[in-house]
């Protein structure tokens, strides 16, 4: 019997890669919830694609369909504005509650690593001082992990996401600004600072999601939380890789410290939100994470240079 998977956010950057991966690597039937099908660059004339015209705001209309699904992948989110809580918390809660626990094998929810500490525990600061988006993702996860479907739930927490090309796949938020950043490399090369992070390309996210859907992930203690990203790299490593790629030599560098940033803020009367100040103090966004290799896969974009070569 053909397996059925319900996908939200299929027209976004990560969504495009997931749809493409599932079409190429499984024989499943995909049900895509799309507000604007014209944004989907994948050939949706395939007999394995069913387009459902709508969005999370009217998810109740699709309750009977969702109850029949073997799998669910929810990548859709509201990034800010008056509907942030409605979409990211209430409607996602409704979506996952419509799944039949006797039918659904696995449900994947996309959150953000920004709400976690390095041990994958929820950070109270995300709820207390986070942006509307951050706070809503924090609240949603708490609710989803208390639903009956929690035993089948895998929450993935992408780190810094690259991907897209502006043609058959839309850019991620980070990749959309990459060309602009590269213009400033002649100046950035003179700077250094303490900090570290993970990154991952949307292609590799899609690899991981497909693997998780097909094979599952047993950590012995559901629901599962997985931070996905390549091994950590320092900010200074990133600067060095970008400079090497663009052939800008590094001679000497100015140390950018929190004290220096605060001085610049004071001199120019720059305002910074409480959440941004918290992130500035954190500096190291490093987690207990998994890579494609941890699941027996091979990352297509293991290094920053691989990503830059696609720009």
Outline where the language-model segments fall.
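Terminal hydrophobic/aromatic helix or amphipathic segment near a protein terminus
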Residues: 239-287
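N-terminal Rossmann NAD(P)H-binding glycine-rich loop of SDR-like oxidoreductase domains
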Residues: 3-28
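A conserved pocket-lining segment of Rossmann-fold NAD(P)-dependent short-chain dehydrogenase/reductase
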Residues: 178-200
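Glycine/proline-rich active-site loop of Rossmann-fold NAD(P)-dependent oxidoreductases
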Residues: 163-178, 213-225
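Conserved beta-loop-beta element that borders a ligand/cofactor-binding pocket
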Residues: 143-168
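Substrate-binding strand-loop-helix patch
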Residues: 194-203, 224-245, 258-262
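Conserved Rossmann-fold NAD(P)-dependent oxidoreductase catalytic core, especially the SDR/UDP-sugar
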Residues: 93-136, 154
């Amino acid at each position: 019997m053909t397996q059925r998977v319900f996908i939200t956010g299929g027209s976004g950057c990560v969504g495009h890669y997931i749809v493409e991966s599932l079409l190429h690597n499984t024989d499943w039937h995909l049900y895509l919830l799309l507000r604007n099908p014209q944004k989907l660059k994948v050939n949706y004339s395939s007999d394995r694609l069913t387009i459902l015209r709508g969005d999370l705001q009217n998810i109740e209309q699709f309750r009977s369909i969702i109850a029949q699904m073997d799998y669910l992948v929810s990548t859709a989110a509201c990034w800010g504005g008056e509907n942030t809580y409605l979409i990211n918390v209430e409607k996602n809660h409704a979506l996952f509650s419509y799944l039949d626990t006797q039918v659904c094998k696995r449900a994947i929810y996309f959150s953000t690593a920004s709400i976690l500490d390095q041990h994958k525990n929820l950070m109270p600061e995300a709820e207390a001082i986070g942006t509307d988006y951050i706070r809503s993702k924090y609240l949603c996860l708490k609710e989803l992990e208390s639903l009956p479907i929690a035993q089948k739930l895998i929450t993935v927490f992408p780190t810094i996401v690259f991907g897209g090309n502006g043609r058959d796949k839309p850019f991620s938020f980070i990749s959309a600004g990459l060309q602009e950043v590269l213009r400033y490399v002649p100046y950035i090369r003179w700077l250094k600072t303490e900090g570290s992070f993970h990154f991952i390309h949307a292609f590799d996210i899609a690899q991981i999601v497909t693997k998780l859907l097909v094979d599952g992930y047993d950590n012995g203690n559901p629901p599962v939380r997985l931070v996905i990203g390549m091994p950590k790299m320092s900010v200074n490593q990133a600067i060095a890789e970008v400079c090497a790629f663009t052939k800008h030599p590094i001679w000497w560098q100015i140390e950018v410290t929190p004290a220096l940033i605060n001085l610049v803020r004071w001199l120019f009367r720059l305002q910074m939100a409480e959440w941004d100040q918290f992130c500035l103090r954190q500096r190291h966004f490093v987690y207990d994470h998994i890579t494609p290799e941890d699941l027996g896969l091979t990352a297509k974009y293991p290094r920053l240079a691989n990503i830059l070569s696609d720009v």
